[in-house]
Design a protein with these regions (language model features):
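Conserved beta-strand and immediately adjacent loop positions that scaffold enzyme active sites
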Residues: 16, 23, 113
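Conserved active-site segment immediately N-terminal to the catalytic lysine
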Residues: 1-20, 47-52
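Short beta-strand-to-turn element immediately C-terminal to the catalytic PLP-Schiff-base lysine
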Residues: 2, 10, 24-29, 69
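PLP-dependent aminotransferase class I/II
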Residues: 29-195
Length: 195
């Protein structure tokens, strides 16, 4: 938790550091937060006998931990490859057609996803799919409009920026295995689709 009380990491197979199935970790330097996280991950129990709150069965098993330990030395190289692909997208003129991810001066992006913005995101996704290039909008319906959570939103809640981001975002191909030729092909396909 360098920036807050705790930090979370997902090790889902599609993430930058993947395990074989679902997995994750929480880091903190707060003993009370650490105790609560440990309790929640084991059904809400501190001692396997008394359940003091409703929890989950969310322990990282030894096989997943072993896979992560084997893959961890690859992470820096994979992240460098993702950054190189992102740099190539930007250098190739992609920004002439879509809004690129904005750099943050105090951080170094590892580009789990490469998300661009366009008022024609759905049209662009269809054009890329026709060329065999995978691209998608991940969060088209914002959480305050999802059936399971809409009841928690205050009546009349308007989040125009959130709704705009949901409509206009599109994740382009990204990963450490992405080649320069694939990046160039995607940039060319975006240019052709959006003119």
């Amino acid at each position: 938790g360098a920036l807050g009380d705790a930090a979370t990491f997902s090790f889902f197979p599609s993430k930058n550091l993947p395990c074989l199935g679902d997995g994750g970790a929480v880091t903190t330097d707060d003993d009370a937060v650490a105790q609560r996280v440990r309790r929640l991950r084991f059904h809400g129990s501190d001692d396997k006998k008394t359940f003091v709150e409703v929890g989950y069965n969310s322990r990282l098993d030894e096989l997943q931990a072993a896979v992560l330990r084997l893959l961890l030395p690859e992470l820096d190289g994979w992240n460098a490859a993702r950054r190189a692909a992102a740099d190539r997208y930007a250098a190739g003129g992609l920004g002439d057609h879509v809004a690129l991810p904005a750099p943050v001066a105090s951080a170094e992006h590892v580009h789990h996803l490469y998300v661009v913005r366009s008022d024609r995101a759905d049209e662009l996704a269809a054009a890329l799919a026709a060329q065999g290039i995978g691209a998608r909008g991940y969060y088209r319906t914002p959480i305050h409009l999802q059936p399971a959570t809409a009841g928690f939103a205050p009546a009349g809640l308007e989040l125009p920026g959130t709704e705009l981001a949901a409509r206009t975002h599109l994740a382009l191909p990204m990963g450490p295995e992405l080649t320069a030729a694939q990046v160039d092909e995607t940039v060319a396909a975006v240019a052709a689709a959006l003119g």
